[in-house]
Design a protein with these regions (language model features):
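Hydrophobic membrane-insertion alpha-helices, especially the h-region
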Residues: 15-26
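Juxtamembrane cytosolic interface motif at the C-terminal end of transmembrane helices
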Residues: 25-33
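N-terminal compositionally biased, intrinsically disordered segments and leader/signal-like regions
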Residues: 8-11, 44, 54
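Initiator methionine at the very start of the polypeptide chain
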Residues: 1-2, 62
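Ser/Thr/Pro/Gly-rich low-complexity linker/stalk segments immediately outside membranes or between
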Residues: 32-50
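Hydrophobic-core positions in well-structured secondary-structure elements of globular domains
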Residues: 50-406
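N-terminal Sec-pathway targeting helices
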Residues: 5-17
Length: 406
């Protein structure tokens, strides 16, 4: 762990919002409906999330705010968001400290922390589904050099500054403290900007929700064909059970699912993709419409349930999480959108207990065998001893002085 590691591997770009950020928002596909009839849903109160106070989790769905969940497989309800950086950090921590194996909390771990760790262990994120241009990560010692490396990397790659590094406890970092950091940043645009609705509308069961929309309903007739061509239906059972994609200029796909089914984003995605297999993919006609709420969220979440968790990792060491947090800034409007998310996990990796260290000191009776490593069947492919090996020399030593001439 003496070497700093900044990573960001060249990968295939996939559907940005579908894979990286998923928000439970509504999409309206309808045939000649009035705006007031098609715009119904539950508002996401982004303003209630406090992005500046890591002392508490500002995102509690039950309180009407937006909850930034830690794992793609975590339970969701109400208003939730998920983005990949925290999972990337967790996966790096597994790979660095526990040979890629699941991080299992010790027996005294609180139930909430254990549940969150289980969800992160189950939610491994495939960075092969992200292009290199979208993300950066670091795994290594937590020190001034690490901070300098991260700040220079994200400035060069994204022209961005960190919103999270100042919130980490650098003063208490010692030689055993590790930092796992990731940033995802991307902007996308629609080749043909959608029309902004001149009036705000309802959402869900609240006709007075005062929600801003964009789409095709208020677009001039000569622009509708190009706007509708950006929208591809995935399935349509009714105006309350439908899904579509919206293509961006950069090739990303915005995936929108109305009345999503499932208890986690993972289940919602799986169910939507299953429905899309047999769905109605006919292009929208000039008499059909699309509309979507504008989105603007800025969230900082500190995962207190993870902090203090201790894990038994490889080589008899222990790993204890000190801090775990994530940010999400996302916008979506008629012209396109942006996503910026950072996550960091700091953890102390303790050395072996001296009493638990193994000592191979042959200072009493011992046997010695010599095996030809080049002969067939004596060693395995990685050079280790085969169970079928045949030694060509064997010694049994009970008095080492007899075996020495000086």
């Amino acid at each position: 762990m003496s070497k700093l590691q900044g990573t960001g591997k060249t990968r295939l770009a996939m559907a940005l919002v579908a894979v990286v950020v998923i928000l439970a928002v509504g999409v309206y596909l309808n045939s000649m409906q009035k705006p007031s009839e098609s715009r119904q849903a539950k508002t996401s109160d982004a303003d209630a999330a406090n992005p500046n106070t890591p002392e508490k989790n500002p995102a509690k769905s039950a309180d009407g705010n937006i909850e930034l969940v830690a794992s793609y497989k975590a339970d969701v309800s109400g208003n939730n968001a998920w983005c990949a950086p925290l999972q990337i950090c967790w996966d790096q921590m597994r790979n660095t400290t526990n040979a890629g194996q699941a991080l299992e909390p010790t027996a005294d771990a609180p139930t909430e922390g254990r549940s969150l760790a289980d969800a992160l262990n189950a939610g491994t994120f495939e960075t092969t589904r992200l292009s290199d241009a979208l993300w950066y990560s670091y795994a290594g010692p937590m020190n001034a050099e690490a901070r300098r490396q991260i700040e220079e990397a994200i400035a060069q790659k994204f022209n961005q500054k960190s919103d999270i590094l100042d919130k980490l406890n650098w003063q208490s970092a010692n030689e055993n403290m590790l930092l796992f950091y990731a940033m995802l940043y991307h902007t996308f645009s629609f080749e043909h900007p959608f029309a902004l609705s001149p009036e705000k509308g309802g959402f869900g069961e609240d006709p007075e929700a005062n929600v801003s929309y964009f789409g095709t309903e208020d677009a001039p007739d000569d622009q509708r064909r190009d706007l509708l061509a950006q929208v591809t239906p995935l399935y349509y059972s009714s105006s309350d059970d439908c899904a579509c994609t919206v293509k961006t200029k950069e090739g990303d796909l915005l995936v929108l699912v109305k009345k999503p089914k499932g208890s986690s984003f993972s289940e919602i995605w799986t169910n939507a993709m299953a429905a899309a297999q047999t769905g109605d993919h006919r292009p929208l006609s000039n008499k059909e419409d699309f509309s979507c709420p504008k989105l603007d969220v800025d969230i900082l979440t500190t995962y207190r349930a993870l902090e203090g968790l201790t894990f038994d990792v490889t080589d008899g060491r222990k790993l204890k999480i000190a801090q775990a947090m994530q940010t999400l800034k996302m916008t979506l409007d008629n012209e396109g959108g942006s996503v910026k998310s950072e996550a960091a996990i700091t953890a102390e990796l303790t050395s072996l207990d001296p009493q638990g260290l193994r000592t191979f000191r042959f200072d009493d009776s011992f046997a010695l065998f010599l095996v030809d490593g080049k002969a067939t069947g004596n060693v395995t492919g990685d050079g280790s001893l085969s169970s079928d090996a045949q030694p060509y020399l064997a010694l049994l030593v009970n008095d080492a002085k007899l075996w020495q001439t000086d």
